[in-house]
Amino acid sequence: MGYWKSKVVPRMKKLFEKSPAKKEVVEEEKPREVEVVEEVVVKTEEPAKEGETKPEEIIATGEKEIEIVEEKKEEAKPVEVPVLAAAEEKKPAVEEEKKTAPVEEKKPAVEEEKKPAVEEKKPVEEEKKEVVAAVPVAETPSTKAPETPVVETPAKAPETPAAAPQKA
């Protein structure tokens, strides 16, 4: 207890003596922060007033945009004729696709040649799997389990010598 009173208690008192001084300094800084916060609030209120006028402008522009969209819809009706012209332009593209189709037919022929080679490899892998599977089965303890009952049969062997003296 002497160590506690002489070393620990005085250090704790020093810690608490320093903290009130720091708290006073922090308290002085808080009013400054509040002023800054108030300024920020005032600044945010002013743009809000400006923002209120902006939505009215946006609404007005929105009506103009609606009118423009309606005008574009009217213009879209005569545009249907160029769409038919675009369909005619697509027909030559279909012919070009037919020309490229024979090239695609050649590629599958090459792929077909590769497939038999892959098929030949697969049976080899299956044979390996079968061989590997057969080896562990022979070594498993389950095959040794039937041998254990065979060991128990010699326990019956003493009974047979007892039967042998009866014959003699």
Swiss-Prot record:
Stretches with biased composition (Low complexity): 152-168
Covalently attached lipid (N-myristoyl glycine), positions: G2
GO BP, sorted A to Z: cell morphogenesis; cortical microtubule organization; leaf senescence; negative regulation of microtubule polymerization; regulation of cell shape; response to abscisic acid; response to arsenic-containing substance; response to cold
Gene Ontology molecular function terms on file: 1-phosphatidylinositol binding; calmodulin binding; microtubule binding; phosphatidylinositol phosphate binding; signaling receptor activity
Tissue and organ expression note: Mostly expressed in the expanding cells, specifically in roots (except in root tips) and flowers (at protein level). Also detected in cotyledons, hypocotyls and trichome stalks.
Biased composition regions of type Basic and acidic residues, renumbered to the chain: 88-131
Annotated region described as Disordered, given as residue ranges: 88-168
Sequence ranges of the Sequence repeats: 26-30, 69-73, 94-99, 103-107, 110-115, 118-122, 124-129
Keywords: Calcium, Calmodulin-binding, Cell membrane, Cell shape, Coiled coil, Copper, Cytoplasm, Cytoskeleton, Lipid-binding, Lipoprotein, Membrane, Microtubule, Myristate, Repeat
Induction (UniProt): By arsenate As (V). Accumulates in response to abscisic acid (ABA), gibberellic acid (GA), cold, and drought stresses. Induced by various salt treatments such as NaCl, KCl, MgCl(2), MnCl(2) and ZnCl(2). Expressed during leaf senescence.
Coiled coil feature spans: 56-77
GO cellular component, one term: pollen tube
Residue segments, region 7 X 5 AA approximate repeats of V-E-E-K-K: 26-129
Cellular compartment(s): Cell membrane; Cytoplasm, Cytoskeleton
Superkingdom of the source species: Eukaryota
Reported cofactor(s): Cu(2+)
Protein topology in the membrane: Lipid-anchor
Observed phenotype of the null mutant: Altered cortical microtubule arrays. Abnormal cotyledon pavement cells with fewer extension lobes and shorter cell length.
Family to which the UniProt record says this protein belongs: Belongs to the DREPP family.
Main function: May be involved in intracellular signaling through interaction with PtdInsPs and calmodulin (CaM); may keep PtdInsPs attached to the plasma membrane until Ca(2+)-CaM reaches a competitive concentration subsequent to an increase triggered by a stimulus, thus leading to PtdInsPs release and subsequent activation of InsPs-dependent signaling cascade. Binds to microtubules and inhibits tubulin polymerization. Regulates directional cell growth and cortical microtubule organization by destabilizing microtubules (e.g. in cotyledon pavement cells).
Name by which UniProt lists this protein: Plasma membrane-associated cation-binding protein 2
Species of provenance: Arabidopsis thaliana (Mouse-ear cress)
